[in-house]
């Protein structure tokens, strides 16, 4: 099997992966939980918790691969024995050596870490540093200790039930189910005995308890349903699969048939990305460019957007051939590296929320990155042709120039909008701080490149 076919097949298997468990936990997926400053479905809470703990969206126990919902539900409802399951991620080899752990392993049990004296000392050191000055920079090992401590706290919160804040209480924070709660007792009984009727009865009791609270403290059922749909859809995974098919089709199938089919795959991927962004906007109530994950996905989207725009004008496959590798690489990175790129939807701090100028500034600047990413792709096509001794047509050079023009235009507008945002927020348009200075330097460098091409004629 070729690497490309293997990659596509793996993506399909990931998209349709069904967690193994005797009970149908679909009803639990849509139960609202308050965590991380917002209300979210249990499905999302479970996925984010397991990613935070293990760096993966699934856990293998006794040779059986378990999805996030069944894993987190088991930690919550049947916690006995989980302290001996390798669940806590430690990725830094030096830190593992420091703790005397097996450097070839990535996951460790709660018990072996909780009883590790060197880890305890490292956590006490970090705590003392933070108590003295919360802004003090930590070294690599101290940062790793802090991260491991956070993961241990996640585990403790799950097995104790403290993290499963399911009940609106009329206050800002929701509460976990009490040990004597009838819904919790039914859920636990049904889960332990694989009794679907008892488990569903527990869910019904829990929904009744949630519905009995004041409406203004409850989660919006429509938003919860939309987020469950989004979480199960994996739109950005499907987008990179379709972009990959588009790029391969354009590369190996010459002629009009290959061009039309490649166009169709790229357009389908683009549209499913649009669906993904619309869903994230509805869920979060803001523009989808507030962290590195969203920025990477947005740049991939913009790269295909500009490629389709130029293809509609020039009818040349070079734009899509240049855009698809960039988009595929970006989306695969976002899809497969959750520890590096956190896909969780977080609420914005008040100073950044509901700020029109900040939103337009960030969207415009990141779209300029997309145009430059397309220029990168087209530029590599030119380099490839030059290396193999193939003639580079003037039209191809012109395509590269056009993509750079779009990037420079958007970068200039975005830089100006950044000044407008600064003036709106802090009362000054330009202050020559490092970020502003380097934004101007980047713009001037690209302007020099564009004008230098004309001067060289």
Language-model region placement:
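Soluble extramembrane regions of membrane proteins in the secretory/endomembrane system
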Residues: 20-229
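Membrane-interface interhelical loops and short amphipathic "cap" helices
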Residues: 31-33, 209-233, 275-296, 338-363, ...
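Generic detector of multi-pass transmembrane helix bundles and their immediately adjacent loops
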Residues: 303-457
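N-terminal secretory signal peptides that target proteins for export/translocation
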Residues: 1-4
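Core alpha-helical transmembrane segments of integral membrane proteins
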Residues: 218-328, 334-337, 344-347
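Short hydrophobic alpha-helical segments that form membrane-spanning helices or hydrophobic packing faces
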Residues: 43-49, 298-299, 368, 440-441
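Hydrophobic membrane-targeting alpha-helices
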Residues: 15-20, 254, 277, 308, ...
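Bacterial N-terminal signal peptides
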Residues: 6-17
